[in-house]
Structure formats: structure tokens, C-alpha cells
């Protein structure tokens, strides 16, 4: 009996000296689990939730080796969510904070990618060039060359684009696509083209400039509208309705100048559409998963009190 009491006493005393690691009202947050929770939200396309989870990770584990990557992936979330200016803000911070580490090179590339996706290929090209000049990592460098080729195609610089695609190394996974695009880029020089100047000159005869740009319906409308207005103005003056005639002449000047402007603008639209359709039918093989691949180092643990 005495032995049992002694054992019970020692057991209770041991609990008092070494309490449980987790007390009621506490949870353990593991750095690796927290990071993976954020990463899984990113993979599912839940970008705002992923941002919150990455920020929570950074807050609780500011010394963790994955903090640079977490900050970088916040920028990726905003990029994928098409919040390009916000993405650039975070990516620029990563670039400045961790230069010249590889994560800064990826951040610099994605700043260029944000401009490319926004439709600013000239601005994007500057960042891709900087990646090529600064970062020797083959995958990153070849991706920047590949995207620089696309940026030049967006500006209708077909020969420059072709030469750029040829710079992608044969060892790169992008090489087959780059080789194909190098040939197809040159086809852009042979795409149909409508001269805006010619369209404007032809529009001296109302509607003819529209016909030149294959806008036959608009050409017919322009011809009828201008023709009827001119006829009505002439009839008004013939019947001594000078005020009405003056109003009709003023209207016709507006219709006529609008007809010329519309024909010139139509030529520009035609050229843009033909080239955009051509580019749309080309295959872009750049996979941005290259920039969000998993890394699995061991993590720390942190207790949080409710």
C-alpha cells in the first residue's frame, strides 16, 4: 500500500515538474506546415488566402530560411491574380533585399512578366535583358531569352524576335519551342498590311477607305450618309433655305472628316488584329511553375496562445 502511494506521489510530482508541452488553450504552429498551407492555397488558385498564409508565416517565423521564398511567392500570388502593380511592389522588394541570390533573379524576371502580361512589351524587355546580363542560372537565363523573343514579337520586330529565340540553349526545355518560334516569327513579315495613308487618301471618296480595309458595311454607310447630306445641303441652297443649308454643310464637314479618320483608324485596327491573331495561334511554352517549384526544408515550431 505504501509503495502504491509513493508511486502515485512521484507520478503527480513529475507532472508538476514537467507539465505537458501543449497546455489547454494553445496550438502548435509548425513552420513547414504553415508554409505548405500557404503554398497549397497558391496551387489551388486561392491567391488572397495564400497571401494571408504567407504573411502569417513571415510574421511567426521571421528568421526561417524560407522567408525570402515566402515574400517572393506573395508577389507570385498577386501576379497570378492579375494585380500587376501590387505584384511589382512585392517583387521589387524581394529583388532589392536578396540581390544577387537566385530568388532575386526570379523576382526580376516576374517583374518583366507582369509588364508583358499587362501589354507593355517594351518595358518588359528591359527587365528580361537585365536578367540575361546578371543571372547565369541556365533555366532562368533561357526563360528570359525566350520571353524577350515574345516581347519583340509583340512589337512586330519579327527578325529581332527570330534571332532572340535562336539564343535559347539546346539543353533548355524551351529549346524545341524556341526553335519553332524562330522560324514562325519570320512569317510575321509577310502578314497582310493595310497602309493608313492609302486608306486616308481613298477616303476622299466617302466609303472607299473603308472598302480598302475590308469594312464594306461601314463603307456603304459612309457613302450613303455623306451622299445624302451633300444632296440635302444642295437642295436647301437651291430653295434659298440658306440657314438649313449652312447647318447641313457643317454636319457634312463633320461626317466627311470623320469618314477619313475612321478609314485611317480602320487600317491600324486591321493591322493590329491580323498580327494579334497570328501571335495568338503560336504556342507559348513558358510554364511559370518553374518559378513556384516546391522546396522542402525542415521547419521550426511555434506555440500560439489563444
Regions found by a protein language model. Name each.
Residues 192-269:
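Hydrophobic alpha-helical membrane-anchor/signal-helix detector
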Amino acid at each position: 500500500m505504501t509503495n502504491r502511494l509513493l508511486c502515485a506521489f512521484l507520478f503527480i510530482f513529475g507532472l508538476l515538474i514537467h507539465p505537458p508541452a501543449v497546455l489547454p488553450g494553445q496550438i502548435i504552429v509548425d513552420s513547414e506546415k504553415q508554409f505548405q498551407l500557404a503554398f497549397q492555397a497558391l496551387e489551388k488558385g486561392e491567391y488572397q488566402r495564400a497571401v494571408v498564409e504567407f504573411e502569417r508565416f513571415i510574421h511567426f517565423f521571421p528568421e526561417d530560411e524560407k522567408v525570402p521564398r515566402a515574400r517572393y511567392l506573395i508577389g507570385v500570388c498577386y501576379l497570378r491574380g492579375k494585380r500587376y502593380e501590387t505584384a511589382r511592389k512585392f517583387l521589387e522588394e524581394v529583388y532589392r533585399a536578396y540581390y544577387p541570390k537566385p530568388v532575386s533573379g526570379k523576382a526580376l524576371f516576374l517583374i518583366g512578366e507582369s509588364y508583358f502580361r499587362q501589354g507593355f512589351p517594351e518595358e518588359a524587355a528591359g527587365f528580361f535583358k537585365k536578367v540575361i546580363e546578371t543571372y547565369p542560372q541556365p533555366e532562368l537565363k533561357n526563360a528570359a531569352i525566350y520571353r524577350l523573343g515574345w516581347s519583340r514579337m509583340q512589337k512586330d520586330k519579327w527578325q529581332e524576335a527570330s534571332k532572340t529565340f535562336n539564343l535559347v540553349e539546346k539543353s533548355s526545355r524551351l529549346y524545341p519551342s524556341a526553335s519553332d518560334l524562330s522560324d514562325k516569327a519570320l512569317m510575321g513579315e509577310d502578314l497582310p498590311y493595310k497602309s493608313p495613308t492609302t486608306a486616308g487618301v481613298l477616303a476622299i471618296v466617302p466609303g472607299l477607305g473603308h472598302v480598302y480595309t475590308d469594312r464594306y458595311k461601314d463603307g456603304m454607310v459612309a457613302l450613303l450618309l455623306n451622299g445624302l447630306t451633300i444632296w440635302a445641303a444642295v437642295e436647301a441652297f437651291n430653295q434659298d433655305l440658306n440657314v438649313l443649308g449652312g447647318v447641313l454643310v457643317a454636319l457634312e464637314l463633320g461626317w466627311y472628316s470623320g469618314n477619313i479618320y475612321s478609314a485611317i483608324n480602320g487600317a491600324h485596327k486591321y493591322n493590329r488584329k491580323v498580327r494579334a491573331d497570328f501571335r495568338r495561334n503560336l504556342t507559348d511554352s513558358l510554364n511559370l511553375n518553374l518559378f513556384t517549384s516546391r522546396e522542402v526544408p525542415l521547419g521550426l515550431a511555434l506555440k500560439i496562445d489563444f
